[in-house]
Amino acid sequence: MAQITAKMVKELRERTGAGVMDAKKALVEVDGDMDKAVEFLREKGMAKAAKKADRVAAEGLTGVYVADNVAAVTEINSETDFVSQNDKFVKLVKDVTKTIAEGKPANIEEADELKMDDGSTLDQAFVNATATIGEKIVLRRFALEEKTDDQEFGAYQHNGGQIGVITVLEGADAATAKHLAMHIAAMNPKVISPDELDDEFITEQLALMNHKIDQDNESRELVHKKPLPHLVYGSEKQLTDDVLAKAKEDIKAELKEEGKPEKIWDRIIPGKMQRFIDDNTQVDKQFAVLSQDYIMDDSKTVGEFLKEKGAKLVAFQRFEVGEGIEKKQEDFAAEVREQMK
């Protein structure tokens, strides 16, 4: 039987990322053959990964990487936020995101086959990570954006990598592109322009907003405050010429009823019309980035800010860890009982 030295264990650990005891056991099992030990650990890792396949991985990190005219954002999940702070996990996220930016795969299946710097595929890297870290580790999703030489990328990660954003801007400098990425991280828009919002989506969101108004009005009634009116419209898409013309006539009728002199109406009407538009584009303000108040200067919208800069937002991607994943609710008492059987 071959003698297993500390040097052999160290080499195997460097090649596979395995723990000391796992590396030593593998070398013993294959009588010191290094290549067979690597294969042994690989198969063991696949078995461990298979056992963890049905677990919910909803924690983790986003990764952001820019390589010349290509940028990638990824979401890589673990089962606990504790593991997401592990140095090995953090390095894996960086390496995988870099590999995807450079390889430009079309989907997860293609990404799994990409080779990393150490020669392993992404798929094998996740199997190894699951085995060595001890939790299910998966690439949930990724997005790629490409730009031309005269465009600019903005890249930003928030809250230690819980949110990752990339932007593509035309006619802007790097600082503007990054500031807009920061805005998107904070405000979570879904589209660039209100034109991209689906009519059914606008109707659904308007109903939710009016439901919230109803709840607020119940509280206002308790303190004898005037109830807030329901929103009639939610997007500039719904503010047709006829709608705006009627709103203007209603404002004139209101001014007349209040006894305001006609000669000052022209000074009052524009402000009231803007208020009408602001009140009836709340869905736009929540979901369309160009309609949102700019977080660096809320006296203007993002659209107004970009116009001042002579810039245009071409595309953006925003990933937040765990979006849309139903997290498993742990029953710790049941878990303890199960372990005591």
Swiss-Prot record:
GO terms for molecular function: translation elongation factor activity. It is found in: Cytoplasm. The keyword Zinc does not apply. One of its GO terms (cellular component) is cytoplasm. Residues 80-83 are annotated as: Involved in Mg(2+) ion dislocation from EF-Tu. Its main location: cytoplasm. Keywords: Cytoplasm, Elongation factor, Protein biosynthesis. The keyword Cytoplasm applies. InterPro entries: EF-Ts_dimer_sf (IPR036402), Transl_elong_EFTs/EF1B (IPR001816), Transl_elong_EFTs/EF1B_dimer (IPR014039), Transl_elong_Ts_CS (IPR018101), UBA-like_sf (IPR009060). It comes from the Bacteria. HAMAP family: EF_Ts (MF_00050). Belongs to the EF-Ts family. Associates with the EF-Tu.GDP complex and induces the exchange of GDP to GTP. It remains bound to the aminoacyl-tRNA.EF-Tu.GTP complex up to the GTP hydrolysis stage on the ribosome. NCBIfam families: tsf. This is Elongation factor Ts. It comes from Lactobacillus acidophilus (strain ATCC 700396 / NCK56 / N2 / NCFM).
